Structure formats: C-alpha cells, structure tokens
Design a protein with these regions (language model features):
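Entry/N-cap segments of selected transmembrane alpha helices
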Residues: 22, 128-153, 198-200, 306-332, ...
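Hydrophobic transmembrane alpha-helices of secondary-active transporters
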Residues: 35, 105-132, 268-271, 288-310
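Interfacial helix-loop-helix linkers and transmembrane-helix boundary segments
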Residues: 40-49, 69, 104, 125-140, ...
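Alpha-helical membrane segments and immediately flanking helix-loop junctions
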Residues: 107-112, 120-128, 139-151, 155, ...
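Alpha-helical transmembrane segments
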Residues: 191-208, 319-328, 350-353
Length: 407
C-alpha cells in the first residue's frame, strides 16, 4: 500500500508538512470549490471568484517536494505554479524556467502592471457625466466613504503592524483592488500576497455583503427615494476628453508616485470618449477581461496553505473587514448628510457608492433602492461618487506611499 501511495507525490506531501498546514490545505481545497460554486451561482463576483476558486483549489492540491531555487541542495514543499519569494535576478530567471505562471507574475504583478491594466479597462467602461456635472456632490459623498482608509491605519499600528504595513492594509478600505496591489508593492512587499488575497476576497463579497449593512442602517422610506427632482447634466465628449487630460495631468503633477494609475484610468476614459471602436474593444473585451482573469487566477494560486497559516493572516482578515465596514458606514453617513441638505431629494444610498469598487457599490445602491421602489433608478447618480471614490482613493494611497516611506 505504501508503495502505491508513493507513486503519487501529492498525497505523500501531506505527511511531509506540519499538521496545521495539512489541515489548512484541505480546508482551502474545499474553499476553492465553494468560491467556484458561489461565483458560478452569481452569489459572489463571478469574474473574480471563478478563476480564483480554480487557483485556490488546484494550487493546494498540487503541492510536492522539489528543489529549493535559492539553495538547490535542499528540498522544500512547493508547486509548479509560481514562487512569489524569489528576489535576485538569477532566481527570477531560474524560476521562469520552472514555474509556468512565473513570467506573468514577474512581469505584471511585481511591477504593478496588472493594476494599471485593470485601471485602463475600468476607465474604458466608466461614464463621467454625473461626476463632471456634479463634482462637489460627488466628492462630498466620496470623502466620508474613505472612513475605513483613514481609521484602519491607527488600528493596524495598534495591532502590531509597522506604519508601512498599516498603510498598505488601510487601503483595503478604499475597496479598490488595483490600488491595494499598488500600495502593498510600494510599502509592504513582505505582505503583498496576504494583503492582496484578503482584499480581493472581501471585494468579491461586497456585492452580497453591503446590502445587509444598508438594510440595517437605512429605513425603507429613505431607500425608496426616487431622486426624480435631480437631473443629470449632459456632458459632451469634448468636455470629457478635456476633463480627463487636464485632471490626469494635474493629479500626476501633484501625486507623481501614483501617476501610472492616473494615466491608465484616464487613458481608458479617453479611449471611451474618442469613440475609436478598435481601441474600445481592445481596452474592454481584451485588456480588462484578460487582466481580470489572470488577476483572479494568480491570486488564487498565491493562496496556498503556507500563506493561511502565516501568523499575521488572521489579523489581516479582521482589519480587512473593519476597513470595508467602516468605509460602508462612512459612505452611508455621507449619504444621510446630503439627503438632509437636499431636504430629502437625494437618496442616501448613493453615499455607499463612494466606496470605490467600480461599479459594484453603485450597483448595490441601485439594487437596494429598486427593491423598495421600482421607480428609484439611482444608478446614474451613484456613478458620480463611485468615480470620485476612485480619485480620492488614489490620492490617499499616493499620500500614504509618499509620507509613510519617510517614517
């Protein structure tokens, strides 16, 4: 029997690892099945959960004993997927010849390119009308929705993280996945994998989780406000093009550390408004779809048992939840404020759209309003603070990266 088992190194690897890691590995395999299933059923975000679930399931199944790239004379448990711990150029070259996902990881994740590609795609599907027509209102709603980004920083320091790690974790409150990737690469490379995985796990739950927060904090009579007295100013394509190039230039000038993200986002917007069909197809159907697929799959492949048993992982899960919860509460408080200032003309649910998970939080706000009042079509109004949230999150992230590096 032992000889038969030894033919299958994946099974043998269970006996070569600590008990807690073996248990975590089994749990993660089933968790991968769950992510895939709930993504397929549209309970969780399918674009992320389906590839991530496949990655989590298969990477934890495919563990075996193999030579250590750093010291080939030693053996270690690993996979044939990728190694996120390689550092020197020689190790990178050797890893690319062993791990099939290593080239994609090294050339798109390690330098933040994947975040820029996602941002370009998001820009290409973003409608700016309400934001440009009502910039003050949009920003008034977006700033309170950064509550988690501000408050999670001191909480993370209190829980034992250094300022650079705390700032990276705090960006989860902005609910902007590419921004979290960017911040963790700049500030806390040692926690890049767990922070990225935790952020995208929670972001995939936003669509199903925030409705419970909304129903707990906002009575039906407010949720059903139809905003019929509000109008959306029609903005011409020329105005959007001018806005994109001017604002992108100013933001890059003020916050050059985040210039790659600003450039990517506003280039996507310019592609959309220029109406060049080939560019629009390329940015949306190819770049955004392809980068989202590889983002989800590689993040899933990074979620191996050794990451889960990392002592800081439990703290990261707590802090990620706190960050998104506080941002959701802050967004709704901002929504209540503008509802009061407008004497009930504005639905407070547009406030939660300031949490910049584009366009998920805007869709959540619209869905919850529409459930109460079928005439409450607030999606166009929610997109304003949604886009403003992207900009405020980028600015706060740039401030964290610039200032915290000096500590």
């Amino acid at each position: 029997m032992e000889q038969i088992i030894n033919v299958f190194p994946g099974l043998v690897s269970f006996t070569q690892m600590p008990m807690e890691m073996a248990i975590a590995r089994i749990v993660l395999i089933f968790m991968g099945f769950g992510m895939l299933y709930f993504g397929y059923k549209d309970v969780l975000e399918p674009l992320l959960m389906i590839p991530m679930g496949v990655g989590v399931c298969l990477v934890n199944a495919g563990i075996l004993m193999m030579p250590d790239l750093i010291d080939p004379s030693k053996q270690k448990l690993g996979t044939m997927f990728l190694d996120s711990m390689v550092q020197t150029s020689d190790q990178h070259i050797n890893a690319m010849q062993v791990y099939f996902l290593q080239p994609i990881y090294a050339l798109t994740f390690s330098n933040g390119l994947i975040a820029c590609m996602v941002f370009l795609g998001i820009g290409a599907i973003t409608e700016l009308d309400f934001f440009i027509g009502n910039p003050k209102l949009s920003l008034m709603l977006a700033i309170p929705a950064e509550l988690g980004t501000f408050l999670t920083f001191p909480i993370a320091i209190w829980m034992g993280f250094n300022p650079r790690e705390a700032a990276s974790i705090a960006t989860i409150g902005g609910a902007d996945g590419p921004m979290v990737l960017f911040a963790s690469l700049k500030l806390a490379k040692n926690l890049f994998v767990p922070i990225s995985v935790v952020s995208y796990l929670y972001l995939s739950i936003v669509y199903s989780g925030y409705p419970f927060l909304i129903k707990a904090l906002v009575p039906k009579r407010f949720r059903g406000i139809a905003m019929k007295e509000m109008t959306i100013t029609k903005v011409s394509a020329e105005e959007k093009l001018a806005f994109s190039i001017v604002v992108g230039t100013v933001l890059s000038l003020l916050f050059p550390v985040a210039a790659p993200l600003f450039v990517s986002f506003f280039l996507g917007v310019i592609i959309r408004e220029s109406k060049v069909s080939r560019y629009m197809f390329f940015a949306d159907d190819i770049i955004l779809t392809g980068s989202t697929l590889f983002l989800g799959f590689i993040l899933g492949c990074l979620l191996s048992a050794d990451v889960v048993v990392e002592p800081k992982m439990f703290k990261l899960l707590i802090l990620g939840f706190i960050a998104l919860f506080l941002s959701g509460v802050g967004g709704l408080l901002g929504g209540y404020a503008v509802c009061w200032l407008s004497r009930g003309k504005i639905n407070p649910l547009v406030g939660i759209a300031g949490v910049s998970c584009v366009p998920s939080t805007a869709k959540v706000a619209h869905k919850c309003a529409n459930e109460v009042n079928e005439e409450a079509f607030i999606l166009p109004f929610a997109m304003g603070p949604n886009i403003a949230g992207v900009i405020t999150t980028a600015i706060i992230t740039a401030c964290y990266v610039t200032k915290v590096q000096l500590l």
